[in-house]
Amino acid sequence: MGTEVVAVALPGREGRIAEKPVTQLHTLVDMLVKVLPVDLPFAFFGHSLGAIVGFELARQLHERSMPLPQHLFISASLAPHLCRRDISRARLSDAELLRLLEGFGGTPREVLRHPELRDMVLSILRADFNLIDEYSVPDGYTTRLPITAYAGTMDNNVSLDRIMAWDRWATDDFSLHLFEGDHFYLVRQRRSLIGSLLGKWHEGT
């Protein structure tokens, strides 16, 4: 039997661009739990914010006594217990957010120069920061999963020690794999990343 990849399109993005972005993580996870197919073995892959969404989704599945992912693949993300900030980045001015976005890389300059597109991107970024900057792992959560972490060697946004901190939430099966590139290394390293993901997934299934 082959492996099926199911992509998650969040409100306010891609084909759902006309919808209002979700700003509360529990609301987003509730939406995902309702549509998640759990009748076959599955794993989660999340890049940046998506890694935290995957972690919290797994936590909610555990809380509801539903099947858990057999593996959690995270990319370019700090560990969940390090997310919460005293002041959310969603409160930054447009100019401050824009500088932050430029530091991430991955967004074409043409988009940032176009007022309407730039405002749309900043709106999504604010929603993302609302999701992640006020998140904290609830007390008493002890379930551990096999976790594989990925990162770019030149990612200036997430330090390796913050990525390595994911081992706190892993079983003995934790590993880190580095690819040449920045926060969006996976754009150029897609083929190698997919090969690694499938290889690790097939090892455990």
Question: Where is each model-derived feature located?
Answer:
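Non-catalytic, mobile gating and regulatory segments of ester bond hydrolases
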Residues: 1-205
